[in-house]
Amino acid sequence: MSLSLPSPSTNGSRLTPVESRHAPLFGFALLTVSCALASFALACATPFAAFAVIAAAMLPLRPALLVVTGAWLVNQGIGFGALHYPIDGNTMLWGAAIGIAALAATAAASAVLRSLPQNSTPLVLAVALICGYGVYELALLAATPVLGGADSFTAAIVAQIGVSNAAWLIGLVAACEIVRLVNPFKRGHIAS
């Protein structure tokens, strides 16, 4: 069984679960709920590269960056508020580094999605994830000389988090497709 996604809409989006006017709000809701789930389940391994690809596939770059920033803020709020991350300079700087890395991943995913052909969406989403994840991890690795933690960048750990991001991307694409199929926001749809 192959994934058959609709062709991109006139605004260039690869994922169109809702009309383009609802896309920023839907993207924000999808990623903040997903981020809350991931933050409690995975703590520091929140799949921001997958979030970046979903946002970039649904939205132009600026709204995608805003949506990913919102997801990052949710992650930080849960981390410091509910999970009781230590409130110290190093932890806060790592939080900022994660936010910067997530935004860099979003920009990279957006560039990939804009530059590759509009057909073959599943393959292009995979390429966008690989590029976005690479940028995300490199941005975090660049912070290690100042913040420490280089021992967390072993091949096994990076691969495990990469697989987690791939699984989250598949799940988020599936959620988008389900919403597209049962979209309550379609024109002419009357709520019962």
Task: Label every PLM stretch briefly.
Residues 2-59, 63-66:
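Hydrophobic transmembrane alpha-helices
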Residues 11, 30-31, 76, 83, ...:
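Membrane-helix boundary/juxtamembrane interface motif
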Residues 16, 20, 49, 53, ...:
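Membrane-helix interfacial "entry" motifs
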Residues 25-29, 65-69, 95-100, 126-130, ...:
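Hydrophobic alpha-helical transmembrane segments
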Residues 31-40, 70-83, 130-142:
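Aromatic-anchored segments of alpha-helical transmembrane domains
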Residues 39-105:
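Alpha-helical membrane segments and adjacent membrane-interface helices in multi-pass membrane proteins
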